[in-house]
């Protein structure tokens, strides 16, 4: 399953999902329209969808989350590790100060709560109990590289790319890195 970032939809991850499908993966979008921000209801619905896919396929699901979508992926893996095989985050701000990105103010304006006081019970930097790979870029432009890379204990592996924040979803090298992370880490 590929989970889009803040203010993004499944349409924005089309190239990434197509690349994964071409590589033989059974790919699902998140199916919740525009990702407007963190909410317990949205996270619970996503967790139910992941459980349904895992039950139908009789195996855990691999989650790929771009930006805010990666935070959802990490939290679902913590809540339901039996349903998640691994997590790959793409420029997701899971480590350090939540204001270390360029759109925190927009998130707060749209959602009406501080970016460092999310309305869900979570510890963003805690590593999920499944293999967790963080893809990050010094050239991201939106999320600080340290926030998306994390500290050594916050991910099992980190992979540096050279792409913009939105480039994680369509640049061929980024798509290839996601496929590699799903296969080998």
Task: Describe the residue ranges of each PLM region.
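Post-His helix in hydrolase/transferase enzymes
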Residues: 43, 170-182
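Conserved strand-to-loop "acid loop" that flanks and positions the catalytic carboxylate
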Residues: 133-141, 161-163
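C-terminal alpha-helix
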Residues: 49, 53, 177-185
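Catalytic histidine-centered segment of alpha/beta-hydrolase-like enzymes
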Residues: 39, 164-172
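Conserved alpha/beta-hydrolase "acid-adjacent" motif
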Residues: 141-147
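Serine-dependent carboxylesterase/thioesterase catalytic core
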Residues: 1-11, 15, 21-32, 37-130, ...
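Active-site regions of enzymes building and remodeling cell-envelope glycoconjugates
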Residues: 148-161
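Short glycine-rich catalytic loops that host catalytic nucleophiles or stabilize transition states
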Residues: 30-32, 158-164
